[in-house]
Amino acid sequence: MSQPPPPPPPLPPPPPPPEAPQTPSSLASAAASGGLLKRRDRRILSGSCPDPKCQARLFFPASGSVSIECTECGQRHEQQQLLGVEEVTDPDVVLHNLLRNALLGVTGAPKKNTELVKVMGLSNYHCKLLSPILARYGMDKQTGRAKLLRDMNQGELFDCALLGDRAFLIEPEHVNTVGYGKDRSGSLLYLHDTLEDIKRANKSQECLIPVHVDGDGHCLVHAVSRALVGRELFWHALRENLKQHFQQHLARYQALFHDFIDAAEWEDIINECDPLFVPPEGVPLGLRNIHIFGLANVLHRPIILLDSLSGMRSSGDYSATFLPGLIPAEKCTGKDGHLNKPICIAWSSSGRNHYIPLVGIKGAALPKLPMNLLPKAWGVPQDLIKKYIKLEEDGGCVIGGDRSLQDKYLLRLVAAMEEVFMDKHGIHPSLVADVHQYFYRRTGVIGVQPEEVTAAAKKAVMDNRLHKCLLCGALSELHVPPEWLAPGGKLYNLAKSTHGQLRTDKNYSFPLNNLVCSYDSVKDVLVPDYGMSNLTACNWCHGTSVRKVRGDGSIVYLDGDRTNSRSTGGKCGCGFKHFWDGKEYDNLPEAFPITLEWGGRVVRETVYWFQYESDSSLNSNVYDVAMKLVTKHFPGEFGSEILVQKVVHTILHQTAKKNPDDYTPVNIDGAHAQRVGDVQGQESESQLPTKIILTGQKTKTLHKEELNMSKTERTIQQNITEQASVMQKRKTEKLKQEQKGQPRTVSPSTIRDGPSSAPATPTKAPYSPTTSKEKKIRITTNDGRQSMVTLKSSTTFFELQESIAREFNIPPYLQCIRYGFPPKELMPPQAGMEKEPVPLQHGDRITIEILKSKAEGGQSAAAHSAHTVKQEDIAVTGKLSSKELQEQAEKEMYSLCLLATLMGEDVWSYAKGLPHMFQQGGVFYSIMKKTMGMADGKHCTFPHLPGKTFVYNASEDRLELCVDAAGHFPIGPDVEDLVKEAVSQVRAEATTRSRESSPSHGLLKLGSGGVVKKKSEQLHNVTAFQGKGHSLGTASGNPHLDPRARETSVVRKHNTGTDFSNSSTKTEPSVFTASSSNSELIRIAPGVVTMRDGRQLDPDLVEAQRKKLQEMVSSIQASMDRHLRDQSTEQSPSDLPQRKTEVVSSSAKSGSLQTGLPESFPLTGGTENLNTETTDGCVADALGAAFATRSKAQRGNSVEELEEMDSQDAEMTNTTEPMDHS
């Protein structure tokens, strides 16, 4: 019977219920504000999971949902409940955590279902696995170890009557935890009226709530177990107790219910109690009222079953009070002598096929059930209610009680049972739960018995097929379908086609499947060798830090891997220990080479040295290390003690440090892998909240407790951390010399065997304590310089400007200071507030934009700094593989595009406001560097910024916007205005210059930039070139070109994204054989060429133009000797370019210059800007010198090439572009 909807007002939705008003001062409450403010609030907040066993770091938008789901334990918490909520101001954290994990939809560990949500480290499925053991085992109070109950003289089976006075009270912070707190199956709606009546009887306080239990056919015993201890730990014992109880008291039950239950039914009733009972087909699975009555007698306490108000008023047995009528009342009391208080369960829907428990809330008043909701007794006389339930004066009763099982005891009990589970099954229950989560639930397989999952998990571990990701913690299985390995299968056929006849003495490797197989000739199948096979990537997050798992759930670590053990004294700053050679260390070792020479034999070995361990016994002992090395390579050698002493001396020399903070650990890939659930150390959390010390792409120091990153990002973090320490050491000349690799001298005072007590450097331990009087700020200029500045808490705006001026030699009036995310300008204080401190926090980053009127001294310093940073950047990024750099660039571009979309802007409009993206370390800078390399004047375009061409400026070490008609412009928010102003000015100049230089304004012009063509009709149909903008031919700056180079062929390759020019060292570049009909190349933009038919030109018109060009060239060749002789007397050398310009302009009307030439000519210059400084003024000299060296035969077959010159066509619409130069 369906329940009609409740009358208005409408009930609050289950997730989440209305809570107390939030305080405006809280960051979390600010995040929950709605309306226009909510839409404009683009802040990103972070906080820690409040579960003490989890404490994962969570990131969420301020304008997002008011409840946050933990990515580690799966619980959902209100924002007010998160610990250490603070604003994240760094864009890198936002991109790599919010966008990558939430908006990008990157595959990660699957969302945890209700069975696997962990509270205090325990999930429902974990408890279900341990429940059968708890039915037979107890815990020895003295040893804390599990012991058989019969060995403790407590019988074979756990007596559930011992829980008769226990009651679970849920913690307020867990009320809304999915899978543990409030039930989400619809019971809140179905039981609304009933719960409202209970609420009114308890002074309008919500003190009795329905909580979740899994619907797996054991919901009644799950509900009772949760009502008793809060966990589903005792469902198995309750079923066995119930079955035993019915068997022992069957005669009394048959006599009591002979009018209602036939004698033949009792066998089925008892069988249904069995934990492994499987109902016949067509019979509904579940326990009935008679079983609830039996459980009340087992527990020696009443059980009250509630329903909706309409159900309770109906004539059906939908609600009842089940009394322990077969048990004497004096045995239904607790240790205090009072009657055991009833527990309460209810139906969750009108289908009445699922039980849920109703429990009280810890810290609130015990819930009271009013008299009008107390159902009638079931199966026994009504007057027994007063005998078994203590009624209040108003006729109601208290539910549950306050004798709860302590969490500490419960966890000890679980730990003891886990040991038994390991002994019985050879696998840890948490690993079985993970197998169920990742291999069954994710594929939609439900209803699989825990025994089957346990067996499957155990076999996977024994076969070495289980792997765990160190990043997201997900399990992955190396599994290959058996049919692939049999004849006709994918791998079988591949092996046979590659190797021919398969042999039993060979192994066959399949790298794409991460599999190594042997051949079984008897069965004619391939047999996987999982011991030699290794999974290379996580199936969920695709991270490469994947390790095999043992049966006890431990991970088979490799040297350098970060473990789950906390570290309090590590210099690396990650807060966790590292695995090395079977032990866990606070730090990674330092590595240095050593050479052993003995008996004419030379051996080179690497020594791994531990020196800063909090446990001094783990520090390396120089004599032990030396002895092991000598014994390893020269075992049993007589007199090797001398070699040992030599090795000791060498090691002491290598490990002696002048600076105690010199710590350069070995670089291990994945050693500082970012993981979900990492948190800051307790020392850091005990301080006042500080910003996360994560600065920009070039200088960021990633906090490992707060990020979930890919392999590329982790590697960059490690390398940039090293770079930051190097840059700090540049401040003194002495440390500069050490950085360049000068040999360190041994100082006896610095030789030590024990751990160092010196504190870690700030960059190595970004979370190290800083005094409240100082704050360190990372400053980056738009020309690539950077520095860490220490400010006092009282530093004002003008004092900050002075600090910047001292550090970077930038006058205050040229400083534009930006901070925050998105970057906003830090304005000078208003009148009367000059003494106010600047609103910067410890760890913030600010960017200095240097205004245009920058002094020469500042430019010189910038160039020097840019050069220095560039060299260090090469040293850092040189360690990364090209694949990793490509992956990093793709991820950052993807994040940038999504963030721009969220901001409501296109990518260019958003990116031009972030100039650092076009500077060293920025994403566009990195893409160009990775794709084509960096060379001064080299042009490129990006697919994400259509219609924009960029050029590399080596002096400033940045990319600039290239506008053919106007020049190069530094990227900034106002770059579009600068371009418009420059284009307008150039157009005006171009109009005048164009009309003066040629009386004919045809389709082709020859100016100082070469031949240009009007493209007003076709230009909008041309796709911009997206490859490299290399220089064409010889880009020599000398106007007197090599005569031999002029005889080489034209460099012509149709460019599809690769270099279409040869290097200047090649003397015979490849020739492009042009076809007059369809293979003509026309240059339409810097680095852009296209076919003639693509431009839709008339072939006849082009042929006519080609002939005119041939006539022009022939005329020039015939008159060249006379022209050179008369040059000095008839005209000045500077008149020659103008005269040739007029000739070409009046003769050549359209078409491509190179197809009209009888010979091939080398090309000079490259995709340079139209207003770049070329050798225009020396054209005459170049022509004179060049033609003077030619022989008469050469004059008949070739023409002098012209240098690149500027050209503007006043009649072109909006733009002009240079053609290839001849």
From Swiss-Prot:
The modification Phosphothreonine is found at T763. Its EC number is 3.4.19.12. Residues 208-361 form the OTU domain. Keywords: Acetylation, Cytoplasm, DNA damage, DNA repair, Endoplasmic reticulum, Golgi apparatus, Hydrolase, Nucleus, Phosphoprotein, Protease, Thiol protease, Ubl conjugation pathway. Residues 1057-1074, 1143-1157, 1210-1222 have a biased composition (Polar residues). The modification Phosphoserine is found at S747, S757, S768, S994, S998, S1077, S1198, S1207. It is an enzyme of class 3 (hydrolase). It comes from the Eukaryota. GO terms for cellular component: cytoplasm; endoplasmic reticulum lumen; Golgi stack; nucleus. Phosphorylated at Ser-1207 by ATM or ATR following induction of covalent DNA-protein cross-links (DPCs). Residues 1041-1050 have a biased composition (Basic and acidic residues). Residues 1200-1209 have a biased composition (Acidic residues). Its main location: nucleus. Residues 1-21 have a biased composition (Pro residues). Residues 1-36, 725-776, 989-1009, 1024-1074, 1113-1175, 1188-1222 are annotated as: Disordered. It catalyses: Thiol-dependent hydrolysis of ester, thioester, amide, peptide and isopeptide bonds formed by the C-terminal Gly of ubiquitin (a 76-residue protein attached to proteins as an intracellular targeting signal). GO terms for biological process: DNA damage response; endoplasmic reticulum membrane fusion; Golgi reassembly; protein deubiquitination; protein K11-linked deubiquitination; protein K48-linked deubiquitination; protein ubiquitination; protein-DNA covalent cross-linking repair. It holds the Pfam family OTU. The active site is at D216, C219, H354. GO terms for molecular function: cysteine-type deubiquitinase activity. The modification N6-acetyllysine is found at K408. Deubiquitinating enzyme involved in DNA repair and reassembly of the Golgi apparatus and the endoplasmic reticulum following mitosis. Necessary for VCP-mediated reassembly of Golgi stacks after mitosis. Plays a role in VCP-mediated formation of transitional endoplasmic reticulum (tER). Mediates dissociation of the ternary complex containing STX5A, NSFL1C and VCP. Binds VCP and the ternary complex containing STX5A, NSFL1C and VCP. This is Deubiquitinating protein VCPIP1.
